């Protein structure tokens, strides 16, 4: 999933951050480079999970994209009591901005996955909230764009325009055969032309 879409959604619908939302693929790298005022939010691409292929003649998998929203708050005490109350309010804002929202048409609505403390000190609290959204890899209709190598390869084949059929009937009473079965002589022929869209 494009995390820039998540950043834009949080900037638009979480006024508590006053636009202080950034993103990256690794929390340590983001924490060392993005120095925003607090409270601030950082969207981190956390990976994806894939189900097994569920069809025999194609590729179709359910993929769940995972991302974290890491909040960084100022803390006035080592216990984080005041920060815990603020985290409760900010979590509600994150839910309003993200849960049920579809980042693009191929995704199911975003779901909340839970939260956990990353770091606390006398000056700062860092807390992670996890979210996920699922989509299907592999198209449902041939008219949709190819998403896998197999679909791309099949799209390159010529259209199935028709077929020619030769029929050799089984003739178990033919005295020329030692065993019953087809004799190798074509008994009927026909062609089928298929209409093209």
Predicted features, each with a name:
Residues 1-57, 81-88, 156-197:
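Small/polar-rich, solvent-exposed N-terminal microdomains that initiate assembly or binding
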Residues 3, 58-64, 72-102:
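Extracellular/virion structural assembly segments
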Residues 34, 58-60, 120-122:
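Sterically constrained small-residue positions within well-ordered secondary structures
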Residues 40-42, 85-150, 156-179:
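Acidic-leaning, charged glycine-interspersed low-complexity segments
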Residues 52, 78, 138-142:
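Intrinsically disordered, low-complexity acidic/polar segments
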Residues 60-77, 124-137:
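Oligomerization/assembly interface segments of phage tail-like spikes and tubes
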């Amino acid at each position: 999933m494009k995390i820039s879409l998540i950043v834009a959604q949080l900037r638009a619908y979480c006024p508590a951050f006053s636009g202080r939302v950034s993103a990256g693929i690794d929390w340590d790298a983001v924490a060392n480079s993005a120095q925003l005022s607090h409270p601030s939010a950082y969207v981190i691409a956390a990976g994806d999970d894939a189900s097994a292929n569920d069809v025999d003649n194609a590729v179709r998998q359910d993929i769940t994209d995972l991302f974290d929203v890491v909040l960084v708050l100022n803390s006035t005490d080592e216990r984080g009591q005041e920060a815990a109350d603020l985290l409760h309010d900010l979590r509600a804002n994150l839910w309003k901005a993200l849960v049920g929202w579809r980042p693009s048409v191929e995704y199911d609505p975003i779901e909340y996955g839970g939260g956990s403390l990353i770091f606390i000190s006398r000056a700062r609290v860092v807390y992670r909230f996890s979210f996920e959204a699922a989509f299907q890899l592999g198209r449902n209709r041939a008219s949709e764009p190819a998403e896998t190598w197999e679909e791309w390869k099949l799209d390159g084949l010529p259209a199935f325009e028709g077929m020619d059929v030769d029929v050799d009937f089984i003739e178990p009473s033919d005295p020329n055969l030692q065993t019953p079965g087809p004799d190798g002589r074509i008994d009927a022929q026909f062609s089928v032309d298929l209409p093209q869209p």
